[in-house]
C-alpha cells in the first residue's frame, strides 16, 4: 500500500540491470526451502545509512537478512520470531535485540526499514519505530560480508560467521519487494532457490512524459514528480493560468523534469504567504502536497482566521483536515490501516472542495447547495463529507502558513500546537482563478512569501524526537525556563501503567503575601501537570489561588500513548487529552503567568532547597516521581529534544527509548520477606510495608527504635511544611495500651496529624486549626480508631492515607475511613515526633509516652528512622535507642517485704488497662491494691510464684490466675497486662499467656482511697477482702508501671513511702554462676544472694568446698549404727544416697539400710572385687547395679551417688558415666493370673484394667529401721575413710559427730577433725544445712479411682506423698487394706520440703512423648507428730485462723482459689451444693498456711520446731501440681499448726461453706492425671528430675522404659506393736480374698471421681506466708456407659 513505501513517490531512481543483474523492483519469491539465499553487494552501514523493503509472509519464523564482520564481533541480523520482526545487532561485541510489538505473518504487505546511526539502530515497521542502542568503546560497525537475504549459503564456514547459529535459522518464506540502500537499489550478486516474480510489469514502461515505473504492492505505479505532469500515467497537463505570469509555465518546460520544490522544517521554521493583496474567494479549490516525517504531530498548512479557515495537520500520525466556512467546522481524519503516516516515507495528500447540489430528506433540504470535501492520502485512502449549507464560499485575506506558524496553538481550529518537523514538497493551492505553488515561491524567494527560520530547500533527515523513559521515581530532567507571560502552549505524549507521578513542574519568583493568619507567607506562580490515581491533572496558580483541573474521565495509566495539548491565553485555556478538551480559567484578575527557573520533567531533584512546592501538588508532597515514557514535547510550538537534554545532563534513570516489556515483572517473585509485589512500568514495585524490611526488593532489615517512656525521636524539618496529602506507615510493638506513636507538630499552630495508642486501639487525630486562620471551621479534630488489643507485644502495621478531606486509617487488616468537615485541608508542621510530644504549646491534653518498639517509619516516602541512623539527614534529634532491646522503664526496687508506697486513686471506673513489669525471687507478695466504695476493690498479687488478679465490682470477689508455664520468682523480668473493657471482659496476660473471663452483673469499678504499690500498711492485711491470699509485701523490682494510660513516677509521685525503696534494679548482689557452688553443688538464687545445696556432694560449707563430716574405719572394723525411733520409721518410694570414700580393700560394706525385722527390705552400698555397687530389695528379688568399668579401691577419694525410684536405679562414681537399671516383668500381672479363676467373670476385665493402669512392681522401701555404716555387723569390714554421708535428708556422719542419741558407734571408728559448722551456731539436724532456705509445703492427698479406659494410672506416685504406715508393714502393699492405728502414739502427717533444681534436665522418651516433663523438685521430708496430747491441745485451743474473722470457725474468708498457674477463674458467688460434681469443677485451697522451718535443738526428728522467718524462697518449679484433697475432721485437727512454735498444725477450712463429710482416719495416694492413654497399654507417670547436676535418679519400675529420674519420697510411721505386725503378716496370706472383697465393696459404692493434675507438682510456698494446704479438685471425666464405678483405694496411714 502506498503509505508504506519509503522514498518511492518523488525521489525514486530506477535502474534496471540487464544481463546477470536484476533489480529487485521485479520482486523475489522465497519458497522456504533449505539452503535458499540471495546475495547482494555489501551494505555500508558502518556509521549512517538506511535499508528498506516491502514484504509479506504467512510464516512465523525465518531469516530475512544478515551481514557481519567475518566472525569477529559485529553483525546485524533481521529475522522472524513468533510472527514478529526481531533485530539483533552487535557493535564492538556490545549486543542488543529489538523486537516489534506487531505480528506480520498475516499475508499482508508490510514496510520495513532499518536505520543505522553510529551506535543507534532503529527498526521501523509500518511507521512504528523501535530503537536499539549499545554503548561500546568503538563508535562504528565493521562490515566485511555481503548482504544475505532470505538465508545464508551453507558453504560458508561457521567460523566465518559472527552470529552463532545463523546457519540453522529457518529460511524465509514469502515475498520481498523494493529493497533499497537509502534511495538506491543494491546489486544482486547471486541467488539459489529463489523465484523472480512479476517480470515484465515495468519492462514496457507504461508511464508517459518521462515518468518512472515502480511496483507498489505488486502493481506498477508511475512517479511523475520530475515530469511537470500528473495523473496515474503522468499524462495530465498542468493548467496554464493567464494573467499570473509568475505561475505560468512555458511549453518547453512541460516535457522537462522540473526542479523539485521541497524544503526541510525542524519545528521552528515556517513559510508565510501574504494574501492581503489578492484575497481568496472561492467555492471550489484544491490543495496538493507531499510530506515525509518521523513526527506524529505538526501543522502542515493553514489559511484563514476566526470562522473562515482551512487547517491541514498531522495528528498522532494521521492526517487531519479542518474546514470552516463560517457555519461550523468540517473535520476529517485519515489514518492508515496499518501503522502511521510518520514513517519517514513520502506521502501524497490531496484535498478538494466542490460546490454540489445535495438532495436530502424533507422539504427543507431539497435542492440545497453544499460543498463536497474530499481528502485522499497516497491516492488510496479517501474521506468524503459535506460542509454546512449556509456558507459555501471560502474567504481569506490573512496568510497562508506552511510548515508551522508563530503560534500554532492559537490558530483557529488547530488540533495541534506544534509546528511540522520533516520535509514538505510541492505544496500547491489552486482554485478556479489562481494557482499558488507555495513551495516554489519560497524556493525562488518571491516577495510575498516570507521565510521564518533557516529553511533549507532540500530534504534532509530531521532528527527524530525520540521518546525517553523515566525508569525510577527519582529520575528527572531539567528544561530551560518557559518564557510565557500572557499566552503559551505545551504538548507532549505520555505512556505508563503506574497511577501516580509528577510530569511537569515549574514555578516563579517567591513573593511575600499575607494570608488570613496575618503573617507573611511565601507564594509563587506555578504550573504543573501530575498523574494521580491514574487521572491527569493540570495545576495553575497565577497569583490569586490555585486551580486544579481534572483532564481525564477515565484512568490513563493503561500503558497506551496519550497526547496532551495545553493551550493558554491569559486566564483561560484548554487542556486536551486525546482530543478531549477541558476548558479552565485561572483565579483572580491577572493574565500573566510569571515563571522563573527551570522546568522539571518527570520528577524533582533530591535537593529541593530552592523549590517552593505548592501544597496542592500532591505528587510533589508525596514524593511520587513519574515512571513511564514521554515523547514529542513541544513548548510554544517548538520541539524540545528531550533525549539530547537527558544525555547532556547525564540524567540517572532516564533511558532514550520506550518499549513495554511483555512479561510481568512480578512473575519472578522478586520481593523478599513476604513483601507485596506490584507491576509498574517495566519494573516491579515491592511494597515493604509491614515487613520490617526496606530496599528495592525489601532485602534490608529496617532499623528498630526502642522507647522506655522517656525517649523520643524528633525530625526537625528544614522549613515549615504544608501538605494536603500524606502517606504514613510504620510498625510498632508494645505492651502498653497507651502511648504516642507519631505526631506532626507545629510551632505556630495546633495543626497536627497524631497517631497514638488509646486503650489498646490506634487513634488517628487530625487537627487543622481552622480557628486561627479564619477559615470555615470544622467541628474539631477529626478522629478515627482502628484495631483492638494491640498491646500484645506483637508487631502491628499502621498506615494512614490522607488526600485532602479524605482520611483512611489501616491497622493490620482493620480499615477505618472518614471525611473531614470544612473547607480547610492544609496541614502545617515543623516537626515529626515519635515516643514523646515535645512541642506542647498548643496541646491541651498531652498524650502518654510510648513504651515499646518502632520500625519502618515512612512519612511521604521518607524512611526517617533509617535516614536518621545512617546520617542521611542532619535534622534528626534522637533520644531513643536502636535495636530490639528489652525495655525496662523507670525501675524501682523494694528491698524488703515491708516496703511499700501509695499513689493517687486508680481511675478505672468503666474500663482499665494496667501494665507493669516485675522481677523477684520471692514466691509471694502484694503488688497492687486499691479499695473502693462498698465492696469494690482491685488487687494484684504474687502467690506461690504466680500472678493473681482479684477484684470485686459489686457482685462478689473474683480471681483470675495467670497460667504461666512456670513460677515467676526466677529473678527474671516478666510482663503483666490486665485489661477490663466496656463489656466487662477481664483478661490477665503474663508474658505470652493470657486468661480471659466475662463477668456478669455490675460493670463499674468504683475505687476510693490510695493505690498501694508493693505492699500495705501495718494492720491492713487483717482486713483484706475475700480471695486475697497475700499477707506480706512484694520484695523485688517493679518497672514500666502503666495505670490506665498514666505513667507515674513511683518515687516522686508517691503520696506516702515506707521502707527501703530505691530507683533502679540491681537485683541480687550476687548471682548464681557456673562456679558458685563447688563439687557439683546446686546453686539456689535468692534476692539477697544465693545458697548452695551440697546434699549429694559429700562436701559442706557455704559453697560446697569444705569437707563433710569424716570418719576413718580401722583395720579391725567399726560400725556406726543409726536407729530410727519406733514411731518414726519412714517408708519411701524413692531414695537418694551419697557418700565420699577412699579405701584399698577389695570387699566391704560401706552403708546398709534395713527395714523392720521380718520385712526383708534393704539397700546396701558395697565394694566387691574392688568395684562399687548397690544391691537392694523392696519386696520381690534382689536388684543389683554396679560400676563395672573401673575399680575404686585405689586409695583415691571418690564420691558415689545412688538414686532409686521404685525398681529403677542409677549409680554414678565421681563424674563417670551413669549406670542405670530398669527391671523387667510385672509381679502384679503374675499374681493376677494366679487368682484370676477365683474372680467372678464380670470383674475380670475391670481388675485387669486396674492392674494394667497401676503398671508397677512393688516400689516402696517399707518401714526403714536402721542405717549401718562400716559393714562390721555383716562381717564385710570396710577399711578407709567415709565422708559426708547423705541419705534421704539425713547426714548421719554429722549426726554421729554431734552425739545424736539415736546413733551408736562401735569398733575402730575415728572422727577426723572437727564437725563442720552449719549456719554458724545452728546445730546439725536431719534437715541438711544447705536446705535452710527451702520452701516447705504441706500436701495431703486423697484419691479415688474409677476403673475405665483412657485414664491415668491410679496408683503411680510421682511426687513426695505420704505413702505407708507401720500398720502396713507387708510387702504386698498393693493388695492389703490396712486399718489405721488407734494406739497411744497417734498418727503422723508427713511434710515434704520441695526445692527445684534450676537446671533443665534433658527429656527422656516415655510412653506419652507429648507430655512436657515436669521440673526438678528436691523434696526434703519431715514430719508433724500427732499424739493424743497434741490432739487434745488443738481441740481445746481451736483452729488458728489468719483472716479477719479471727478463730471462729475459719469460714469462707479463709478460702482462696488454688491451681496456681492453671489459668482458671473462680466465682465466689456460686451457690453451695452437696453435689460432689461441684467440687470436681474447681480446685480450692485454704488460705491458712503452715509455717515451716528447720529444726532447733538436737536430732529429735519427731518433735521439730518451726520458724518461718528462717526460710527463704528458692527458685520454684516450672510446672506445678494440682491435687485433690479431702481430710477427715480428726486428721484436720491432728495436723493443725499454731504459730507459737509448739506442735505444727494444719488449718481446718471450709470448702465454700460446705462441711466435710466424716472420713476414716486415712490418707490416700493421689491419682496422676497429667495424661491419658489407651488403657490397654501400661501407663506411666511424669517423673520429676533430680536436684543435683549430672546425677540422674531412678524412675518407677516399668520394663524397657527409661525415664527422667524422680524426687525422693519419704514417709514416717507411728509406732506399732509386735502383735499388730504379726497380724498383718498373717493377713498377707489372705490377700486374694481381701482383694475380692475390696473390689466388690468399692465397685458398688457411688462416689465422685477426682482427677489429679500432674502438671502442678508441689508449688513451693513463700517463706513468709503460712504454708497453704492445697485442696484442689478438677473436673473428672465420667464414664458414659457404666452406672457403677470401680474404686481402688490404697490406705497408707
Curated annotation (Swiss-Prot):
Coiled coil: none annotated. The chain crosses the membrane at residues 1619-1639. Brain and arteries (at protein level). Glycans are attached at residues 58, 105, 776, 1208, 1306. Residues 28-207, 260-459, 466-658, 704-876, 890-1065, 1109-1309 form the Laminin G-like domain. It is found in: Membrane. Ca(2+) binds at residues 308, 325, 393. Disulfide bonds join 202-213, 207-222, 224-234, 423-459, 629-658, 666-677, 671-686, 688-698, 1037-1065, 1072-1083, 1077-1092, 1094-1104. Keywords: Calcium, Cell adhesion, Disulfide bond, EGF-like domain, Glycoprotein, Membrane, Metal-binding, Repeat, Signal, Transmembrane, Transmembrane helix. Pfam families: EGF (PF00008), Laminin_G_2 (PF02210). SMART domains: 4.1m, EGF, LamG. It comes from the Eukaryota. Residues 198-235, 662-699, 1068-1105 form the EGF-like domain. GO terms for cellular component: membrane. GO terms for molecular function: metal ion binding. The keyword Repeat applies. Residues 28-1618 are extracellular. GO terms for biological process: cell adhesion. Neuronal cell surface protein that may be involved in cell recognition and cell adhesion. May mediate intracellular signaling. Belongs to the neurexin family. This is Neurexin-3. It comes from Gallus gallus.
Amino acid at each position: 500500500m502506498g503509505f508504506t513505501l519509503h522514498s518511492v513517490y518523488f525521489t525514486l531512481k530506477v535502474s534496471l540491470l540487464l544481463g546477470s543483474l536484476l533489480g529487485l523492483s521485479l520482486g523475489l519469491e522465497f519458497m522456504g526451502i533449505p539452503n535458499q539465499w540471495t546475495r547482494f553487494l555489501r551494505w555500508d552501514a558502518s556509521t549512517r545509512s538506511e535499508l528498506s523493503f516491502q514484504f509479506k509472509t504467512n510464516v512465523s519464523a525465518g531469516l530475512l537478512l544478515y551481514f557481519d564482520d567475518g566472525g569477529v564481533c559485529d553483525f546485524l541480523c533481521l529475522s522472524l520470531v513468533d510472527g514478529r520482526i526481531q533485530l539483533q545487532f552487535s557493535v564492538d561485541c556490545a549486543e542488543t535485540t529489538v523486537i516489534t510489538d506487531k505480528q506480520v505473518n498475516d499475508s499482508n504487505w508490510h514496510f520495513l526499514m532499518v536505520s543505522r546511526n553510529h551506535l543507534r539502530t532503529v527498526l521501523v515497521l509500518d511507521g512504528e519505530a523501535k530503537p536499539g542502542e549499545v554503548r561500546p568503546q568503538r563508535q562504528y560497525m565493521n562490515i566485511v560480508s555481503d548482504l544475505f537475504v532470505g538465508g545464508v549459503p551453507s558453504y560458508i564456514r561457521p567460523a566465518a560467521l559472527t552470529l552463532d547459529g545463523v546457519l540453522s535459522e529457518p529460511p524465509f518464506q514469502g515475498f520481498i519487494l523494493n529493497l533499497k540502500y537509502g534511495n538506491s537499489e543494491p546489486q544482486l550478486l547471486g541467488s539459489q532457490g529463489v523465484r523472480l516474480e512479476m517480470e515484465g510489469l515495468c519492462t514496457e514502461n507504461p508511464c508517459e512524459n518521462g515518468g518512472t515505473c515502480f511496483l507498489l504492492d505488486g502493481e506498477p505505479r508511475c512517479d511523475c514528480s520530475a515530469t511537470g505532469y500528473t495523473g496515474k500515467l503522468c499524462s495530465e497537463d498542468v493548467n496554464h493560468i493567464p494573467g499570473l505570469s509568475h505561475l505560468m509555465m512555458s511549453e518547453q518546460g512541460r516535457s522537462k523534469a522540473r526542479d523539485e520544490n521541497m524544503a526541510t522544517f525542524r519545528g521552528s521554521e515556517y513559510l508565510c504567504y501574504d494574501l492581503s493583496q489578492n484575497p481568496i474567494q472561492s467555492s471550489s479549490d484544491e490543495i496538493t502536497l507531499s510530506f515525509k516525517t518521523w513526527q506524529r504531530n505538526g501543522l502542515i498548512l493553514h489559511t484563514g482566521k476566526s470562522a473562515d479557515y482551512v487547517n491541514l495537520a498531522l495528528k498522532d500520525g494521521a492526517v487531519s483536515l479542518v474546514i470552516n466556512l463560517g457555519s461550523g467546522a468540517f473535520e476529517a481524519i485519515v489514518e492508515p490501516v496499518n501503522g502511521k503516516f510518520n514513517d519517514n516515507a513520502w506521502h501524497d495528500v490531496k484535498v478538494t472542495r466542490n460546490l454540489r447540489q445535495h438532495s436530502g430528506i424533507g422539504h427543507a433540504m431539497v435542492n440545497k447547495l453544499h460543498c463536497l470535501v474530499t481528502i485522499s492520502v497516497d491516492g488510496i485512502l479517501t474521506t468524503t463529507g459535506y460542509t454546512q449549507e449556509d456558507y459555501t464560499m471560502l474567504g481569506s485575506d490573512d496568510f497562508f502558513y506552511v510548515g508551522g506558524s508563530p503560534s500554532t496553538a492559537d490558530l483557529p481550529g488547530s488540533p495541534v500546537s506544534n509546528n511540522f518537523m520533516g520535509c514538505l514538497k510541492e505544496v500547491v493551492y489552486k482554485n478556479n482563478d489562481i494557482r499558488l505553488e507555495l513551495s516554489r515561491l519560497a524556493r525562488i524567494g518571491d516577495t510575498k512569501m516570507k521565510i521564518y527560520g533557516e529553511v533549507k530547500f532540500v530534504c534532509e533527515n530531521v532528527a527524530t524526537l525520540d521518546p525517553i523513559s523515566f525508569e525510577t521515581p527519582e529520575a528527572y530532567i531539567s528544561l530551560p525556563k518557559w518564557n510565557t507571560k500572557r499566552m503559551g502552549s505545551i504538548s507532549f505524549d505520555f505512556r505508563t501503567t503506574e497511577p501516580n507521578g509528577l510530569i511537569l513542574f515549574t514555578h516563579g519568583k517567591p513573593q511575600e503575601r499575607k494570608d488570613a493568619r496575618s503573617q507573611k507567607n511565601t507564594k509563587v506562580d506555578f504550573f504543573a501537570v501530575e498523574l494521580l490515581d491514574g487521572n491527569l491533572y493540570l495545576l495553575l496558580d497565577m497569583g490569586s489561588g490555585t486551580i486544579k483541573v481534572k483532564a481525564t474521565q477515565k484512568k490513563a495509566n493503561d500503558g497506551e500513548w496519550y497526547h496532551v495539548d495545553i493551550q493558554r491565553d491569559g486566564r483561560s485555556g484548554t487542556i486536551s487529552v486525546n482530543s478531549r478538551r477541558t476548558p479552565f480559567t485561572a483565579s483572580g484578575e491577572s493574565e500573566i503567568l510569571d515563571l522563573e527557573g527551570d522546568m522539571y520533567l518527570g520528577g524533582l531533584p533530591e535537593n529541593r532547597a530552592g523549590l517552593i512546592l505548592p501544597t496542592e501538588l500532591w505528587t510533589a508532597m508525596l514524593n511520587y516521581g513519574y515512571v513511564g515514557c514521554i515523547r514529542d514535547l513541544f513548548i510554544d510550538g517548538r520541539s524540545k529534544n528531550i533525549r539530547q537534554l537527558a544525555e547532556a545532563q547525564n540524567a540517572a534513570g532516564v533511558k532514550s527509548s520506550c518499549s513495554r516489556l511483555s512479561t510481568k515483572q512480578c512473575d519472578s517473585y522478586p520481593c523478599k520477606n513476604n513483601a507485596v509485589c506490584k507491576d509498574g512500568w517495566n519494573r516491579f514495585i515491592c511494597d515493604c510495608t509491614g515487613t520490617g524490611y526496606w530496599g528495592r526488593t525489601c532485602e534490608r532489615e529496617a532499623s528498630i527504635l526502642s522507647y522506655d517512656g522517656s525517649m523520643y525521636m524528633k525530625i526537625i524539618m528544614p522549613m515549615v511544611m504544608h501538605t494536603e496529602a500524606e502517606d504514613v506507615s510504620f510498625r510498632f510493638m508494645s505492651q502498653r495500651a497507651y502511648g504516642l506513636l507519631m505526631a506532626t507538630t507545629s510551632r505556630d499552630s495546633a495543626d497536627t496529624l497524631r497517631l497514638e495508642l488509646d486503650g489498646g486501639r490506634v487513634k488517628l487525630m487530625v487537627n487543622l486549626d481552622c480557628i486561627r486562620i479564619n477559615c470555615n471551621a470544622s467541628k474539631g479534630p477529626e478522629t478515627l480508631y482502628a484495631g483492638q488489643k494491640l498491646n500484645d507485644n506483637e508487631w502491628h502495621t499502621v498506615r494512614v492515607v490522607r488526600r485532602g478531606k479524605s482520611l483512611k486509617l489501616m491497622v493490620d487488616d482493620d480499615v477505618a475511613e472518614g471525611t473531614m468537615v470544612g473547607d480547610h485541608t492544609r496541614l502545617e508542621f515543623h516537626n515529626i515526633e515519635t515516643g514523646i510530644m515535645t512541642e506542647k504549646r498548643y496541646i491541651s491534653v498531652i498524650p502518654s509516652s510510648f513504651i515499646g518498639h518502632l520500625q519502618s517509619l515512612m512519612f511521604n516516602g521518607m524512611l526517617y528512622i533509617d535516614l536518621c541512623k545512617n546520617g542521611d539527614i542532619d535534622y534528626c534529634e534522637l533520644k531513643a535507642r536502636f535495636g530490639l532491646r528489652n525495655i525496662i522503664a523507670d525501675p524501682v526496687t523494694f528491698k524488703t517485704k515491708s516496703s511499700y508506697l501509695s499513689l493517687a486513686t486508680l481511675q478505672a471506673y468503666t474500663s482499665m488497662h494496667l501494665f507493669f513489669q516485675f522481677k523477684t525471687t520471692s514466691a509471694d507478695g502484694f503488688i497492687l491494691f486499691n479499695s473502693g466504695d462498698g465492696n469494690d476493690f482491685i488487687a494484684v498479687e504474687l502467690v506461690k510464684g504466680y500472678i493473681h488478679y482479684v477484684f470485686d465490682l459489686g457482685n462478689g470477689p473474683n480471681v483470675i490466675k495467670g497460667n504461666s508455664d512456670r513460677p515467676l520468682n526466677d529473678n527474671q523480668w516478666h510482663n503483666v497486662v490486665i485489661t477490663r473493657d466496656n463489656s466487662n471482659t477481664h483478661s490477665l496476660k503474663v508474658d505470652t499467656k493470657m486468661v480471659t473471663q466475662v463477668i456478669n452483673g455490675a460493670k463499674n469499678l468504683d475505687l476510693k482511697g490510695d493505690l498501694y504499690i508493693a505492699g500495705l500498711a501495718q494492720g491492713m492485711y487483717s482486713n483484706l477482702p475475700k480471695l486475697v491470699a497475700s499477707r506480706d509485701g512484694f520484695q523485688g523490682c517493679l518497672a514500666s508501671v502503666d495505670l490506665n494510660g498514666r505513667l507515674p513516677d513511683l518515687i516522686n509521685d508517691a503520696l506516702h513511702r515506707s521502707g527501703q525503696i530505691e530507683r533502679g534494679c540491681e537485683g541480687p548482689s550476687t548471682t548464681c554462676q557456673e562456679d558458685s557452688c563447688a563439687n557439683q553443688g546446686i546453686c539456689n538464687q535468692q534476692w539477697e544472694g544465693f545458697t548452695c545445696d551440697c546434699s549429694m556432694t559429700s562436701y559442706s560449707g557455704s559453697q560446697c568446698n569444705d569437707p563433710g563430716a569424716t570418719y576413718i574405719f580401722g583395720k579391725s572394723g567399726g560400725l556406726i549404727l543409726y536407729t530410727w525411733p519406733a514411731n518414726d520409721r519412714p517408708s519411701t518410694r524413692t531414695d537418694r544416697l551419697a557418700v565420699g570414700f577412699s579405701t584399698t580393700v577389695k570387699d566391704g560394706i560401706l552403708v546398709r539400710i534395713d527395714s523392720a525385722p521380718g520385712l526383708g527390705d534393704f539397700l546396701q552400698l558395697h565394694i566387691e572385687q574392688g568395684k562399687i555397687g548397690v544391691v537392694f530389695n523392696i519386696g520381690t528379688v534382689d536388684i543389683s547395679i554396679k560400676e563395672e568399668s573401673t575399680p575404686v579401691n585405689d586409695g583415691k577419694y571418690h564420691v558415689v551417688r545412688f538414686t532409686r525410684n521404685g525398681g529403677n536405679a542409677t549409680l554414678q562414681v565421681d563424674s563417670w558415666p551413669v549406670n542405670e537399671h530398669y527391671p523387667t516383668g510385672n509381679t502384679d500381672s503374675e499374681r493376677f493370673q494366679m487368682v484370676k479363676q477365683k474372680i467372678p467373670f464380670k470383674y475380670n476385665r475391670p481388675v485387669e484394667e486396674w492392674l494394667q493402669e497401676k503398671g508397677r512392681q512393688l516400689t516402696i522401701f517399707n518401714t526403714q529401721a536402721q542405717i549401718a555404716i562400716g559393714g562390721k555387723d555383716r562381717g564385710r569390714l570396710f577399711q578407709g575413710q567415709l565422708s559426708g554421708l547423705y541419705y534421704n535428708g539425713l547426714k548421719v556422719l554429722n549426726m554421729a559427730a554431734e552425739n545424736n542419741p539415736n546413733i551408736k558407734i562401735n569398733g575402730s571408728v575415728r572422727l577426723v577433725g572437727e564437725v563442720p559448722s552449719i549456719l554458724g551456731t545452728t546445730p546439725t539436724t536431719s534437715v541438711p544445712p544447705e536446705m535452710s532456705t527451702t520452701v516447705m509445703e504441706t500436701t495431703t492427698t486423697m484419691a479415688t479411682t474409677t476403673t475405665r479406659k483412657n485414664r491415668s494410672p491410679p496408683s503411680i506416685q510421682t511426687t513426695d506423698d505420704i505413702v505407708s504406715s507401720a500398720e502396713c508393714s507387708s510387702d504386698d502393699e498393693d493388695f492389703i487394706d490396712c486399718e489405721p492405728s488407734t494406739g497411744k502414739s497417734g498418727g503422723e502427717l508427713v511434710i515434704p520440703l520441695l526445692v527445684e533444681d534450676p537446671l533443665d534436665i534433658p527429656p527422656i522418651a516415655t510412653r506419652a512423648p507429648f507430655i512436657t516433663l515436669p521440673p526438678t523438685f528436691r523434696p526434703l521430708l519431715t514430719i508433724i507428730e500427732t499424739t493424743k496430747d497434741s490432739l487434745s491441745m488443738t481441740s481445746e485451743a481451736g483452729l488458728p485462723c489468719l483472716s479477719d474473722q479471727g478463730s471462729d470457725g475459719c469460714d469462707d474468708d479463709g478460702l482462696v482459689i488454688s491451681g496456681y498457674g492453671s489459668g482458671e477463674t473462680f466465682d465466689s458467688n456460686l451457690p453451695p451444693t452437696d453435689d460432689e460434681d461441684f467440687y470436681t469443677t474447681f480446685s480450692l485451697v485454704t488460705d491458712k498456711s503452715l509455717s515451716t522451718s528447720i529444726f532447733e535443738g538436737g536430732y529429735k526428728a519427731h518433735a521439730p520446731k518451726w520458724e518461718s522467718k528462717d526460710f527463704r524462697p528458692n527458685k520454684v518449679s516450672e510446672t506445678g501440681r494440682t491435687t485433690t484433697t479431702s481430710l477427715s475432721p480428726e486428721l484436720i485437727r491432728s495436723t493443725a499448726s499454731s504459730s507459737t512454735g509448739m506442735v505444727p498444725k494444719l488449718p481446718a477450712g471450709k470448702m465454700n461453706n460446705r462441711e466435710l463429710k466424716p472420713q476414716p482416719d486415712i490418707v490416700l495416694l493421689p491419682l496422676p492425671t497429667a495424661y491419658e492413654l489407651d488403657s490397654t497399654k501400661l501407663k506411666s507417670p511424669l517423673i520429676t528430675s533430680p536436684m543435683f547436676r549430672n546425677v540422674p535418679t531412678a524412675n518407677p519400675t516399668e520394663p524397657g522404659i527409661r525415664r527422667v529420674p524422680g524426687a525422693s519420697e519419704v514417709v514416717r510411721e507411728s509406732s506399732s506393736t509386735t502383735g499388730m505386725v504379726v497380724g498383718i503378716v498373717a493377713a498377707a496370706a489372705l490377700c486374694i480374698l481381701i482383694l475380692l472383697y475390696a473390689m466388690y465393696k468399692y465397685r458398688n459404692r457411688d462416689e465422685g471421681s477426682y482427677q489429679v493434675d500432674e502438671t502442678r507438682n508441689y508449688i513451693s510456698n513463700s517463706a513468709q506466708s503460712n504454708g497453704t494446704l492445697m485442696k484442689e479438685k478438677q473436673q473428672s471425666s465420667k464414664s458414659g456407659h457404666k452406672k457403677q464405678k470401680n474404686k481402688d483405694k490404697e490406705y497408707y496411714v
